Amino acid sequence: MPRIHILDEETVSRIAAGEVIERPASVVKELIENSIDAGASRIIIEVENGGISLIKLVDDGCGIEREDLPLAFQRHATSKISTADDLFRLKTLGFRGEALSAIASVSKCVEVHTRTRYSPVGTYLRLENGRVAEIKDDGCPYGTSIEVRGLFETIPARLKHLSSPSQELARIAEIVTQMAIIHHRISFELSSGRRTLFRSNASETWDDALIRAFGLRTAKGMISIIAEGDGFDLHGMISSHDSSHHGSELILVYVNSRPVYSKVVVQALREAYRGFLQSGRSPLAVISIEIEPSLVDVNVHPAKREVRFLREDEVYDAVRDAALSALRSSAIPSPPPPARIAEPQLWSAKPQIQRTLPLEVQAEQRISEPLIRIVGQALDLYIIVEDDDGIMLVDQHAAAERIRYEHLLEKCKSGSISQELIQPVTVELSPGEVALLDSFSGELGEIGFEIDPFGGRAYSVRSVPAAAGLESPESIRDVLREILNLGRVCRASFRDEALKHLACRGSIKSGERLSESAMLRLLTDLFACDNPRTCPHGRPVVVRISSESLEKMFGRR
């Protein structure tokens, strides 16, 4: 019996659909793109259970003719292209004729109500497990309404690997927000249950969408960039050097109004920001590039998430130079202090001042003999310690992180971690962050946050984790957003990951010069920890070099 055989059409369709439709947010993205291509001026999205149970999209676009409707759900059926040459002249978002077919293949049921401007009556279509079950006349309004139910019910393995409903909802909110920014002439609305997560008004500029996406405070801190190249134009908004944010960078890139990932654009922005951002700060940027279709390949990724420019160097230079010019104009950084010429020195130490430190740790955790001596500090990062058996290098940041983590964990377990603020701090969240806050409100309470709704997407923070170093309103806003975004990837260990993040954020940093007393205090606290060997993330805190190893290095043995 042959071991290789040709798959049946249904299996092939489901495999292909899995490349296009990865999660509920993929469905929302594809449906929005279809609505935009249909000339919609208003798009309303409603979801239930993070889009797993229901995704409903209603638009006022051109609608679909009755004879075309069944074809729209067949693979490679499209009105956008006819030949391979058309791929190099594309100006629409959808073009491969795979989206609707893929959605129907991985859903239990899809229902469509649609009507064109010139039709006296609309059409209703129901598909079950990818096959047409019913089609009839319908008295629906102009435009199209699509309901997708039971996503991935026919593919249990894919359903099993979805995140929680709140995390899937956060991803949907991100997609809607991204589309609303670049397609600002269209009004968008996203709701889950009875709650409206996002709403934008149609506008000639993207100012309103930026405010609704990032909040007024963040949007006001952004500066405009503009540039031209051979066959392309770009414009965008980037955060100024003093309005950047903590955490990972947030760079939204659009090519011909399509949200994509572009390594070239991201690298160009990073290069522009070099020297402008303080340690731990990241840029926020929204970049739109309009380029001749023949100069960009949008068919690189199955889900159209990545593009490839024909002349990458020109795009890189244009983005970098435009961002650099805007950053220099918005603020001139203070010149660095004149360099001090000194003899080369590996570490700072004062031999005449010796500090000894008795260690009291459990036998199985013992790192050294009961008495050690602080030699000094190397590279403003490592504390050098000597004992009878050799030397130890202690990573000061990892050590401080371990100390703070165990302190926060102890307070969390005892229920004494919450610290009430003298003045509540108001925080405006993105639609995705609102979804995560609803999901993780209990866990946030466990680690010391007390947060109340304040209207719209604004929230009042009344208490924060004690000993977390959250002193300013800005630091509270930043850390809350950072912790919420941890929930996108670590649902099961959210509380522990949040405590690790708090510990890392407030710890002594690399490059910080410490006095002898500060080093002594740090080591005392470290060796009192339950686990002084590693930081909360698993990196080593202490590296030992024995006397015997040193002698071998220098050929004494």
Swiss-Prot record:
Name of the molecule in the record: DNA mismatch repair protein MutL
Family of this protein: Belongs to the DNA mismatch repair MutL/HexB family.
Function: This protein is involved in the repair of mismatches in DNA. It is required for dam-dependent methyl-directed DNA mismatch repair. May act as a 'molecular matchmaker', a protein that promotes the formation of a stable complex between two or more DNA-binding proteins in an ATP-dependent manner without itself being part of a final effector complex.
BP GO terms, sorted: mismatch repair
Species in which this protein is naturally found: Methanothrix thermoacetophila (strain DSM 6194 / JCM 14653 / NBRC 101360 / PT)
MF GO annotations: ATP binding; ATP hydrolysis activity; ATP-dependent DNA damage sensor activity; mismatched DNA binding
GO cellular component: mismatch repair complex
Alphabetical list of HAMAP family matching this protein: DNA_mis_repair
Classification via Gene3D superfamilies: 3.30.230.10, Histidine kinase-like ATPase, C-terminal domain, MutL, C-terminal domain, dimerisation subdomain, MutL, C-terminal domain, regulatory subdomain
Keywords of this entry: DNA damage, DNA repair
